[in-house]
């Protein structure tokens, strides 16, 4: 499904969360558990559908054991 309605920065953020989660071998369910968020919320963040709150950004960063700034790093291909 195309992600036309999402903002590019939300998509980039979600892609980064997904990449970091996958690199750590975590499921969305486990990341949700570690961050205190619901799995469907984590899924919608990864798809770029959420305008995520700062508190939730910190919870995800803590769950992934990375600094918050690491969630905003993008790598050119």
Give the positions of each predicted feature:
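Recognition helix of helix-turn-helix/homeodomain-like DNA-binding domains
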Residues: 36-50
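Conserved hydrophobic/aromatic packing and binding residues within compact polymer-binding modules
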Residues: 17, 31-32, 42-45, 71
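Short basic helix-loop element that most often maps to the first helix and adjoining turn
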Residues: 15-34, 59
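Short amphipathic recognition helices of helix-turn-helix/homeodomain-type DNA-binding modules
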Residues: 70-77
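A detector for short, charged/polar N-terminal pre-domain segments
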Residues: 1-12
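DNA major-groove recognition helix of helix-turn-helix/homeodomain DNA-binding modules
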Residues: 56-70
């Amino acid at each position: 499904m195309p992600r036309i309605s999402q903002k590019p920065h939300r998509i980039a953020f979600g892609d980064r969360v997904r990449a970091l989660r996958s690199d750590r071998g975590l499921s969305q369910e486990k990341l949700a558990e570690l961050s205190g968020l619901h799995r469907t919320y984590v899924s919608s963040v990864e798809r770029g559908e959420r305008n995520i709150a700062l508190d939730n950004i910190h919870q995800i960063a803590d769950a992934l054991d990375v600094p918050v700034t690491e969630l905003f790093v993008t790598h050119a291909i």
